[in-house]
Swiss-Prot record:
Phenotype of the disrupted gene, per the record: Mice lacking Taar2, Taar3, Taar4, Taar5, Taar6, Taar7a, Taar7b, Taar7d, Taar7e, Taar7f, Taar8a, Taar8b, Taar8c and Taar9 show no visible phenotype or behavioral deficits. They however show an absence of aversion to low concentrations of amines such as 2-phenylethylamine, isopentylamine, N-methylpiperidine and cadaverine.
Pfam assignment, any one: 7tm_1
A GO biological-process term: adenylate cyclase-activating G protein-coupled receptor signaling pathway
Name of this chain's protein: Trace amine-associated receptor 7d
Amino acid sequence: MATGDDSFPWDQDSILSRDLFSATSTELCYENLNRSCVRSPYSPGPRLILYAVFGFGAVLAVCGNLLVMTSILHFRQLHSPANFLVASLACADFLVGVMVMPFSMVRSVEGCWYFGESYCKFHSCFEGSFCYSSLFHLCFISVDRYIAVSDPLTYPTRFTASVSGKCITFSWLLSIIYSFSLLYTGANDAGLEDLVSALTCVGGCQIAVNQTWVFINFLLFLIPTLVMITVYSKIFLIAKQQAQNIEKMSKQTARASESYKDRVTKRERKAAKTLGIAVAAFLLSWLPYFIDSIIDAFLGFITPTYVYEILVWIVYYNSAMNPLIYAFFYSWFRKAIKLIVSGKILRENSSTTNLFPE
């Protein structure tokens, strides 16, 4: 699945939209080529601001998710099936920051694709692969949290490392196979040959997607989304009931120490809440883009390019959101960051450091 200008052609709207940001005169991507795409560059001020905003997002996505992966893979205390899913999700977001955002940044600001026709298609495949991989990871994480909250005592025997590994493998393989096969078989632009031919120019990266595949893409987004909403609704109800039960028991045994089950339940509820926020952030970031894709496909690409650019970069910025959410809610992640940044992670036996408060 392509996003951004990959699936929306540069046309007069893109030229007009840049006037909103004080665009200079219209130029060509490649001045010496007859088939060059037209570009309408931003004036220096807005150009610098856009590079700063987009570049900051890429750096945040790379560094933040690298910290998440390093924390989970290095510290033995974090070696759990659920955390391996989180690390794999961070890997998808990390790859967005490395392999997608820098190239999209240049394309968005300069109005041209300077990285070759082959990488244009790869870039679009990477976008789709990482998008669906993140979505499937979040779906499996929601199921994991449901099991943990609904039955915390038997949870370790139900969601094992083997189950986690299968979820990770499924998330990556299905996403990659679907995205690459869609674009490399040409199924995405079947019936749009005339449009593709008319839009093709040197310095452009237009990946057209017909109505059928736009609808299928939307279904692939919608079905896991409905699963996550349903599961987290159940988690909310269970957590509410558990909180009421704990409150009743605390009144009856005010001086009694907290049971192991109660401690586990509280910990799992907090994890479910944090990951639920991550899911909500993902859906809020992606839903406007998918809705706009449906509208464009069936109404003839009516969205102005600058609006499309905004939607796409909201999607990209989602890849930088999860580490910020973890840092805000998880004390163990904040402690892990301090150890990594200070270099204490290089000390002998640092992997056995206790990251959880007593």
